[in-house]
Amino acid sequence: MTENGHPHGRPFKLGDRVHIVDSRDRHYLITLQNNGEFHTHAGLFAHADLIGKPEGTTLALARGMTYTCLHPTLEDFVLKMPRGAQVIYPKDIGPILILADIFPGCRVLESGVGSGALSSAMLRMGAHITGYELREDFANRARTNVESLLGADVLSRYDVQLRDCYEGIDERNVDRVVLDLPEPWHVVPHAETALHPGGILLAYTPSITQATQVRHAMEGDGWILQRTMEVLNRGWYIEGMAVRPDHRMVAHTGFLTTGRWIGEGSRAVTPAQRERVVDSRDEPILDDEPVLEA
């Protein structure tokens, strides 16, 4: 497997993870092993049956059941990966990569690495991550999952330390601070010393009360562009001319709160102050209208 975590359509080989989809749209994730077997209610097949076969190979078993085999995407892996801690799900991981603006070479301080789902996504974007994690079993699981998905070479960009982020951050001039913690507002003062001016803090929190606490912690001088959002994911049923929203949707999982640090002593314009700004016609300037200097 290449360091970017994708086998580029090559045939299956020993040690590969394989995403299996049966004819009833049930999903499985296996690792190809010597003498391994995949057991189902419709029978079994040997892992050796897939070695050397191309991606998209479909195996037929009893009762008309078929099993299509693919290299897993990042989404497939996150949903089926071994875990100790609760993971951040794909519907939030995608927006996090955009809101935190993760880029190749980005220096990230991540606290609360959990099972490594978000770490894997940021590493695939080319980030260099220093992770703080309290529990050794979670840290080991995160390293194992990252290596399993992205290969051993990526571990040179992934340094997970047994540290308590509430007690401080040693790193300086980092680009991003990404938090998945019960009380991330306690880390905001430490992020102020860790981030360079223009850096971004992002906190993932399950409850709006937690998100509110983070926002309150970022009300001081030096923080701008604070915002909080959640992502709701609703699929659609499309069959012929029948089109409707799915009866089930992936609704609330967590809140994403971000802010940019511009440096101690810098005073941001507050929302209340923005509302008092008027143009020459005494009309409020809307947030989505450009402000032109004379």
Q: Where are these predicted regions, by residue range?
A:
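C-terminal substrate-binding/active-site "lid" region of AdoMet-derived donor-dependent transferases
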Residues: W185, H190-F255
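Conserved SAM-binding loop of SAM-dependent methyltransferases across substrates and taxa
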Residues: S115-G126, T193
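Short beta-strand element of Class I
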Residues: A127-Y132, L201
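Conserved class I S-adenosyl-L-methionine
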Residues: F103-G114
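Glycine-rich helix-loop-beta junction characteristic of Rossmann-like nucleotide cofactor-binding loops
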Residues: I98-F103, I169, T193-A194
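S-adenosyl-L-methionine
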Residues: Y132-P184
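N-terminal auxiliary segments of SAM/dcSAM-dependent transferases
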Residues: M1-H71
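Conserved SAM-binding loop and adjacent beta-strand
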Residues: H8-R10, K80-G94
